[in-house]
Amino acid sequence: MMSKLGALLTICLLLFSLTAVPLDGDQHADQPAQRLQDRIPTEDHPLFDPNKRCCDDSECSYSCWPCCYG
């Protein structure tokens, strides 16, 4: 009985370790970092003020945020 339990435990541990393999670079784990890069304002953004090099404080939005709240 104990050998069957040990074999079952070993198989379960091996299967778990195979599912815990790290993700490749092109899979979903890297997507939040890419979304953060998309929030950086550019001169093309309609709220971007070239004199302050950031967005207008009165018109803060999710896509143009560096001068907001700080």
From Swiss-Prot:
GO terms for molecular function: ion channel inhibitor activity; toxin activity. GO terms for cellular component: extracellular region. Disulfide bonds join C54-C68, C55-C64, C60-C67. It is found in: Secreted. Residues 1-20 form the signal peptide. The modification Tyrosine amide is found at Y69. Residues 21-53 form a propeptide. The keyword Secreted applies. The keyword Oxidoreductase does not apply. Transmembrane segments: none annotated. Its main location: secreted. InterPro entries: Conotoxin. The modification 4-hydroxyproline is found at P66. The cysteine framework is III (CC-C-C-CC). Classified in the M-2 branch, since 2 residues stand between the fourth and the fifth cysteine residues. Belongs to the conotoxin M superfamily. This is Conotoxin TxMMSK-02. The lineage of its organism: Eukaryota, Metazoa, Spiralia, Lophotrochozoa, Mollusca.
